[in-house]
């Protein structure tokens, strides 16, 4: 059976519970057509690069699907009809990823931002303060530069 990665964007004013209900509806469509949804990832509400149907943010959801093309086509047809779905994209893949997607790994990495350098010593350039690093000698007296056209 063909394998697909499917991402859809739901309007920002839809609640997370309503997005879960939509996912369950689409899961039912796929299962009725003889397929299965292997993995569901909710990436949360994210800003869009540009406005889509007057929305600046959207709920992002990833579905890893194993289904015949007819079942997938029916799910996509229902998404086109739904006013809550802004956009969707389906990509056929050779195999489905078992580990979390790059978006989920990025979220995990962002959760660790509050960590500091640990037991490593503070580097001089950590604060990007610039200033004298001590690696160059004195430039000495320099003649005054003349800007503005006066000779």
Swiss-Prot record:
Record keyword Ribosomal protein present: yes
Region of interest (Disordered), residue spans: 97-151
Keywords: Ribonucleoprotein, Ribosomal protein, RNA-binding, rRNA-binding
GO function terms (MF aspect): small ribosomal subunit rRNA binding; structural constituent of ribosome
Gene3D superfamilies: 3.30.70.60
Pfam families, A to Z: Ribosomal_S6
Keyword Ribonucleoprotein: yes
Cellular component, GO, one term: cytosolic small ribosomal subunit
Compositional bias ranges of the Basic and acidic residues kind: 105-151
UniProt GO BP: translation
Reported function: Binds together with bS18 to 16S ribosomal RNA.
Record family assignment: Belongs to the bacterial ribosomal protein bS6 family.
NCBIfam families hit by this protein: S6
Name of protein: Small ribosomal subunit protein bS6
């Amino acid at each position: 059976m063909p394998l697909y990665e499917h991402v859809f964007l739901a309007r920002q004013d839809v609640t997370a519970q309503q997005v879960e209900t939509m996912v369950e509806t689409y899961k039912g469509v796929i299962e009725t057509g003889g397929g299965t949804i292997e993995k569901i990832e909710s990436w949360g509400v994210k800003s869009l690069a540009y406005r889509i149907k007057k929305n600046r943010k959207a709920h992002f959801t990833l579905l890893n699907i194993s289904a015949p093309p007819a079942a997938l086509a029916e799910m996509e047809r229902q998404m086109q009809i739904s006013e809550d779905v802004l956009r969707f994209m389906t990509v056929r893949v050779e195999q489905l990823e078992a580990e979390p997607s790059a978006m989920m790994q990025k979220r995990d990495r962002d959760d660790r931002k509050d960590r500091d350098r640990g037991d490593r010593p503070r580097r001089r350039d950590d604060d990007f303060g610039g200033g004298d690093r001590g690696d160059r000698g004195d430039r000495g007296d320099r003649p005054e530069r003349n800007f503005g056209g006066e000779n």
